[in-house]
Amino acid sequence: MGTYAIQLAKRSNIHPIIAVAGKAQEHVQSMLDASKGDAIVDYRKGDEAVVQGIKDALQGRKLLHAFDATAASNSVLNLCKVVDTEDDARITLVLGPEGDVGGQHTEIPTSVQQSLSNVFDVHGTQAELGYVYSRYFTRGLQEGWFRPQKQEECAGGLEGVEDALKKLKDGSASATKFVFKIADTPGAGSSR
């Protein structure tokens, strides 16, 4: 999700983009523009390094807008340490707190506006927005300014799920979406 947010921010000329990534740094770096202040911070170096990396990338500017595409580990807490608490800052997250997917993160200061944004919204109250986005993404794909993540087709259809899960678990897959062709599953489509 983060790579899509980066592409939309770039398209809107929103800079600097300060991205936090791990093994996918090379992929993320290819989307950033250092001449506009964009930077990448490695989350594998720990929370203190993430906070300091964001501060360094800000170069004294205030952080007023943040999009947390993971809401994992301490990402919300790290953002709370760098987001400005006095000037109408906003954090958008893709997940609520653990155990309360649609809830509010209590660790975010009350002076900072928080909102949740996820795909479920387009199946309800945001259906019209979902339609517009789908058309806009299609246009971006056609024009080349919007790119999908790298995909890897897994051999054997659904029999390839185990291998894909192993790659995710051992960390050998990063910034990759796995594709399983159901028709390639042994026995698929046959009647018994």
Feature roles, as predicted:
Residues 1-192:
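Terminal helix/beta-alpha structural elements that buttress the NAD(P)+-binding lobe
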